[in-house]
Amino acid sequence: GAVDSKGNEINRNRLVAVAAAIALEGNDGGMIVTDSITSSGLKQFIENDLGGKHYRYRRGYKNVIDKALELNAQGINCPLAIETSGHAAMRENYFLDDGAYLCTKIIIKAAQMRKEGKELDELTASLKEPLESTEIRYKILEKDFRACGEKIIADLTKYAEEQDGWCVADDNREGVRVSFDRDNGDGWFLLRLSVHDPIMPLNVESDSEGGVK
């Protein structure tokens, strides 16, 4: 990550937003591949403000890079694969997982904007960020933790589909992601199974005070 002129950290969703804004210059309508826990505000920023497309995929930097390579091979303009953890790979840099390259791109962009009398934070001024967010990690005690986790996700998906004010995301590709209307938390959660460990991380975000609870 980095820090802008106001002392705000450029990390997680904000880092993805900055990288996407840079990557989409000269790539109008391009596809940005991210991991699964990116915010709803980031999707809106990429698609509505930048005019790009957002492909929310799975956790793991190799997963997002491989998906970007696959999309490009299919003829889809995909200039960037990035995780909220900061792992980033750009097509112009042969999709190498290269944090130094991204940092250099950000520094160059900041210098260009400074010459225009602007600051880097203006690049993502319209990014809507959640009021509250948290992550809870549930440990699975069953011996066959993968089968257990997959059953929990399947049961939760079915339950969510039956609830008023809940909406199961149709563009999610890992675990189950559910959005909630203003009367039911005003946000979303994602429950997924860890790639290697008997853990089920639950990521929750809300745009209202007390919404996470």
What are these regions (language model features)?
Residues G1-L15, K43:
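Short Gly/Thr/Asp-enriched flexible loops that form oxyanion-binding sites at enzyme active sites
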Residues K6, G26-N203, S208-K213:
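Phosphate-binding and adjacent anionic-ligand microenvironments
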Residues N13-A19, C103:
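Alpha-helical metal-binding/catalytic segments enriched in His/Glu/Asp
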